[in-house]
Amino acid sequence: MSEKEAGIEVQGTVEEALAGGMYRVKVDQGPVVLAYASGKMKKFHIRIIPGDRVKLELSPYDLSRGRITYRDK
């Protein structure tokens, strides 16, 4: 990925699991964003439930949406 397309890495807590594999995540220093699990997380059936700490990658173009890249233990 080029530097222009690189996402912004942030951490947060899952507040709510929505339909269609979407999640409402409260970012530590910011607002609540809408996020989805990355392809590898879906492939390996990693479960994400409300209360989990996660790492997000936010698009520099739309900071209200993101992709969950890691679930903390």
From Swiss-Prot:
Keyword Protein biosynthesis listed: yes
Organism: Anaeromyxobacter dehalogenans (strain 2CP-C)
Principal location: cytoplasm
Free-text function comment from the UniProt entry: One of the essential components for the initiation of protein synthesis. Stabilizes the binding of IF-2 and IF-3 on the 30S subunit to which N-formylmethionyl-tRNA(fMet) subsequently binds. Helps modulate mRNA selection, yielding the 30S pre-initiation complex (PIC). Upon addition of the 50S ribosomal subunit IF-1, IF-2 and IF-3 are released leaving the mature 70S translation initiation complex.
Entries under InterPro entries matching the protein: NA-bd_OB-fold, RNA-binding_domain_S1_IF1, TIF_IF1
Sorted UniProt keywords: Cytoplasm, Initiation factor, Protein biosynthesis, RNA-binding, rRNA-binding
Subcellular location: Cytoplasm
Gene Ontology molecular functions: ribosome binding; rRNA binding; translation initiation factor activity
Protein name: Translation initiation factor IF-1
Assembly with partners or alone: Component of the 30S ribosomal translation pre-initiation complex which assembles on the 30S ribosome in the order IF-2 and IF-3, IF-1 and N-formylmethionyl-tRNA(fMet); mRNA recruitment can occur at any time during PIC assembly.
Gene Ontology terms: cellular component: cytosol
NCBIfam families: infA
Family according to the record: Belongs to the IF-1 family.
